[in-house]
Structure formats: C-alpha cells, structure tokens
Curated annotation (Swiss-Prot):
Motif D-box boundaries: 26-37
Name of the molecule in the record: PCNA-associated factor
Organism annotation: Xenopus laevis
Motif (KEN box): 83-85
This protein's record includes keyword Plastid: no
Subunit architecture: Interacts with pcna.
Motif Initiation motif mapped to chain: 93-105
Length: 123
C-alpha cells in the first residue's frame, strides 16, 4: 500500500501544514490620527458614494408604468387592511375561498339502481 500525505496527517513526523484562512486587509480611510473628521469630507458637504445605485455606465429613464419602491414597503396605515387580517362581514364566510359564489343546496342522492337490485335479490 502506498502512503500519501493525507495518510500522514495525523502523525507528527510528516511535513503536513494545516490550511488557515487568510483575512483581507481592511480599508483605512485617511490616516489613523485623523480623529473624528472621518465622517465629513474636507469641503464640509456630506460625501456621496460614486456608485450609489443604478447603472453607472448607461443611465436609462424610468418608465411611467413602473411602481416606486414605496408602493411595496408602504406603512400598513396608508394601505387597505388585508383580507386575512380583517373580520369577515355577515354575508361572507370566514375561511371561504369562493368570492361571489352562491351556496349550494344540499339534496339527497338519487337511489342507485344496482343497490336496489342487490337488496331485492337477498330477500
């Protein structure tokens, strides 16, 4: 049998080194002695990120039919309450999935001719 480095991993005589994950270097904004001036730019205005969002290469106009993100994340007080969270009215059943369906009247099943023949044959 041939021994490999994987076989010798448990022994201390092999020249096996455990893989260690490396860390990426941290970005430093200015010098470490800058103090509390790191939150504002030298001009006094709040600096904006160069790539704040969207496509920086080809800026395209937003179509008129596109909804804003506020429509999706609006506060619940401005939007209508959801159907699951409101109390059902008198004409609407709780848990019913059919909106506008008329309730069906229950009626007995018509007698099955094969059962009648079996019942009369036994007597």
């Amino acid at each position: 049998m041939v021994r490999t480095k994987a076989d010798c991993a448990g022994s201390s005589s092999g020249s096996y080194r455990k893989a260690v994950a490396a860390r990426a270097p941290r970005k430093t904004f200015g010098s470490s002695s800058s103090g509390s001036n790191h939150d504002t730019s030298p001009t006094g205005k709040k600096s904006e990120c160069k790539y704040a969002g969207g496509n920086p290469v080809c800026v395209r106009p937003i179509p008129t039919w596109q909804k804003g993100i506020g429509d999706f994340f609006g506060s619940p007080s401005t939007s209508q309450p959801e159907k699951e969270n409101r109390i059902p009215s008198d004409d609407e059943e709780a848990g019913g999935s059919g909106a506008g369906k008329k309730p069906r009247k229950s009626r007995p099943l018509p007698p099955d001719p094969s059962e009648e023949a079996a019942d009369s044959g036994d007597e």
